[in-house]
């Protein structure tokens, strides 16, 4: 697995198909697909496809972290190290 989680509940959602109150039912399918993409990625370039991922390197307080979009509000944030997404967590991005 090229994916390590910060939160146990997100890991259980992905590996055991276990629902959690912090994951809105409206994003469950998209979130699972994005986690599959993240898990299968071997290089940063794999995360740029599809363009809807909106892969980016973050700045400021999150310098050294990356993100892909689940939808307009939610992001998966992680540290990309040697082809592995570390400390992956779901962020309800506030605009």
Curated annotation (Swiss-Prot):
Pfam family, one: HigB-like_toxin
Keyword rRNA-binding applies: no
Induction info: Induced by amino acid starvation. Induced by the protein synthesis inhibitors chloramphenicol, kanamycin and to a lesser extent by spectinomycin.
Keywords: Toxin-antitoxin system
Record InterPro entries: HigB-1 (IPR007711), RelE/ParE_toxin_dom_sf (IPR035093)
Miscellaneous information on this protein: HigB-1/HigA-1 has been shown to stabilize plasmids very efficiently in E.coli. Three hours of ectopic expression of higB-1 results in bacteriostasis without any detectable loss of viability.
Role, per record: Toxic component of a type II toxin-antitoxin (TA) system. Inhibits translation by cleavage of mRNA.
Name of the protein in question: Toxin HigB-1
